[in-house]
Amino acid sequence: MNEVMSDPMDPTNPVRFSVLRVPFFLEPAYDTDESFSETNRVRLERKWGGKAAFAAQKHSHRLKERGQEVGIEKFNLDRLASSTLKSHRLIQWITKTRGCEVAEAVYNDLNHRHFVDGKKLNDAEMLCDAAAAAGVDRDEAMRFLESDEGLEEIGDAQEMLQEMGIHSIPNFVVGGKVVVSGAVHAAKLVQIFRRLESTGEGAPGSAFADALRIPPEMRAKTLPAPGNA
């Protein structure tokens, strides 16, 4: 996105991006109680059928290299895996009430706290710390997490994912229509963005904004251009 925003085809009509993170659960059967967690190493060795099989998968997926591409120098394999319901709810709530710029700041912070520092994503105190670091009122964030708000919307989004045949991540839905599956390189996404940019009309819409109840005024908010953040 930064590449396209930094070098627009038409400087008088630069592209802007609105990002909506759609909740997806790698472990939907995980207990949502905050006391539950296990190390990611244990989770993946179980998933792939043992240490040797996990090592082979790790090598073939080039996770280290892909992580470095998005600013994660080294994945903490012993990070705490837990239910991600609370973190998904928090990101959706911030998107609805503050817009995608603040939501992306919290999302990126949570990625570092989890993948690098090893924190678990159902820790309400940690989640509120991340929200506060982005300027969100900490007490307000905690009150939200202690409520049941946002659960119905996340359930609706899960139904949409099933209907669209999306059963893994990462997946990118661009403009509500173009689906790009897998950990593609940034160059592939740039091609898609440039193709949309060349029309001069922008993307047609969002596939999930209605299901996630994103208000129109928040859908209109965009990420700042590089250098303007």
Give residue ranges: language-model regions.
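Structural alpha/beta surface segment adjacent to cysteine/selenocysteine redox centers
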Residues: 2-114
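C-terminal cap of thioredoxin/glutaredoxin-like
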Residues: 1-10, 21-22, 92-229
